[in-house]
């Protein structure tokens, strides 16, 4: 079978499965599986596929038709300037989260020797992206999942950042252990912020494949922010900055949580869709 013929069949199958971007998803699966750049993929659509190649591609397209995300199928996701490997313990990085990276790197000189803490690090995408731009910064990422910590360590090594990044399995609610990490100039977090009642209505790509620990934010979606506000004094240095990713229309309630805890609200940042996605607070 010709590559182009199987590709068009794949696009049709994904369209019928109500995949939002069938052509793009099929392109990524085909190019990754065949190790082709975009230009080569276009030029080789007339070539014959081997039986093994065709079988493998059909298998992967079937998985996508069952709403497994492309990133889960190929085991990686591009985020900021890097590629991050994923496993079942890590949230699939979203483009919206790059808003947090943009906010931090605009606030600090590239050569600034800042110390960064990432609460709930997952794949390590936030911390590692920041360390990539802030070339003299060092950081620690914590996660309650040992599997996520192991994945973050692998990503640090793969992206040449392991000399400045440390990942440890810690629950941010454990103040005693958290306090032993020392104080940081910058703390970042993309905590779970989806209300429990909203989980069932999420897309299959999210509710069936992202870890529930990384999604569910309690009854009102604010539980993690309350927990973080309680332990933040243990890790954020005086005058330090806390950057929090938030869900849609949550800004006023999250501001209230942290300002009542003594933190000064500084700025809000919108994502590409115009939604307020990140809040910045300063430690007294």
Model-found features: residue ranges?
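Conserved AdoMet
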Residues: 32-106
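A general structural signal for well-ordered alpha-helical segments in protein cores
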Residues: 7, 26-27, 57, 67-70, ...
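Non-catalytic accessory regions of SAM-dependent methyltransferases
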Residues: 1-42, 46-49
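Mobile active-site "lid"/loop adjacent to the S-adenosyl-L-methionine
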Residues: 193-224
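Helix-to-beta-strand junctions that scaffold the AdoMet/dcAdoMet cofactor pocket
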Residues: 161, 210, 236-237
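Conserved Class I SAM-dependent methyltransferase catalytic core
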Residues: 219-281
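Residue-level signal for inorganic ion chemistry
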Residues: 29, 67, 97, 126, ...
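Conserved SAM/SAH cofactor-binding pocket of Class I
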Residues: 95-201
